[in-house]
From Swiss-Prot:
One Pfam match: DAHP_synth_1
Reaction catalysis annotation: D-arabinose 5-phosphate + phosphoenolpyruvate + H2O = 3-deoxy-alpha-D-manno-2-octulosonate-8-phosphate + phosphate
Tree of life domain: Bacteria
One BP annotation, GO: keto-3-deoxy-D-manno-octulosonic acid biosynthetic process
Pathway per the UniProt entry: Carbohydrate biosynthesis; 3-deoxy-D-manno-octulosonate biosynthesis; 3-deoxy-D-manno-octulosonate from D-ribulose 5-phosphate: step 2/3; Bacterial outer membrane biogenesis; lipopolysaccharide biosynthesis
Source organism of the structure: Stenotrophomonas maltophilia (strain R551-3)
Protein's UniProt name: 2-dehydro-3-deoxyphosphooctonate aldolase
Main location class: cytoplasm
Protein family per UniProt: Belongs to the KdsA family.
């Protein structure tokens, strides 16, 4: 599949979707995108910048949600212009898709909305590649009907994203088998290494996270074989306005990516058919 000018798939190198969880300010987005571009250029990694203009599913009703669509799109447009990278953002049921699609390169559907048929069709009809996040409550094989709904719109540029499965209360686990199962959708599979270590609602009025396990799960996913890695990152996760406990520090992204690209090359060198 062609995505933002480059090919993605199990026969292609790992690509990266990364950025802060939510748009906090113009300068933070530009600085983070600029640093990520430096790192990915150095390592030869295809990179898409991500950040959200509205986090509609915050634990607390008073938590920071973002600057809103109008201001958020201005920031993302400036990132594209100044840094020269493609951009991705989430959309919601109320989002004017055409307006967002006029700025961003990739649309993303929140995990909680994966079963909303009309929403999935609406997003996939906007004429942009779509990253569909698997719900924490959904089995990996249940992504097949979701993809069928998506592709029925005529959009063939669909990716599926694993972000962990609910395991009891306030906890997620990552079943690496799901990455192989979701290949049966015929779509590139992306692994979300940072939301997978989230502890949803684990801090009472906000979600916790186990950031130290990001490299563990990322390496495991790359060893299984994935097309892309999704990772939220921040210059200072302790001060992030959303999902700080599971965000990976920006200054540690290069070391992590370097390891992952080496693993990716070995995994894809040996192929997958003989293990099927």
């Amino acid at each position: 599949m062609k995505l933002c000018g480059f090919e993605v798939g199990l026969d292609q190198p790992l690509f990266l979707i990364a950025g802060p969880c939510v748009i906090e300010s113009m300068q933070l987005q530009l600085d983070t995108a600029g640093k990520l571009k430096e790192v990915t250029d150095r390592l030869g990694v295809n990179f898409i910048f991500k950040s959200s203009f509205d986090k509609a599913n915050r634990t607390s009703g008073t938590a920071f949600r973002g600057p809103g669509m109008e201001e958020g799109l201005k920031v993302l447009a400036e990132v594209k212009k100044q840094i020269g990278v493609p951009v991705l953002t989430d959309v919601h049921e109320y989002t004017p898709m055409d307006e967002v699609a006029s700025v961003v390169d990739v649309l993303q559907t929140p995990a909680f909305l994966v079963r909303q048929t009309d929403f999935i069709r609406k997003v996939c009809s906007a004429g942009k590649p779509v990253n569909i996040k698997k719900g924490q409550f959904l089995a990996p094989w249940d992504m097949k009907p979701v993809v069928e709904k998506a592709k029925a719109t005529g959009n063939e540029q669909i990716m599926v994203c694993e972000r962990g499965a609910s395991f009891g209360y306030n906890n997620l686990v990552s079943d690496m088998r799901s990455l192989a199962v979701m290949r049966d959708t015929g779509c590139p599979v992306v692994f979300d290494a940072t939301h997978s270590v989230q502890l949803p609602g684990g801090q009472g009025t906000s979600s916790g996270g186990q950031r130290e396990h990001v490299p563990v799960l990322a390496r495991a996913a790359v060893a299984v074989g994935i097309s892309g890695l999704f990772a939220e990152t921040h210059p200072d996760p302790s001060k992030a306005l959303s999902d700080g406990p599971n965000a990976w520090p920006l200054d540690q992204m290069e070391a992590l990516l370097e390891t992952l690209m080496e693993l990716d090359a070995v995994t894809k060198k040996h192929g997958f058919s003989r293990f099927a």
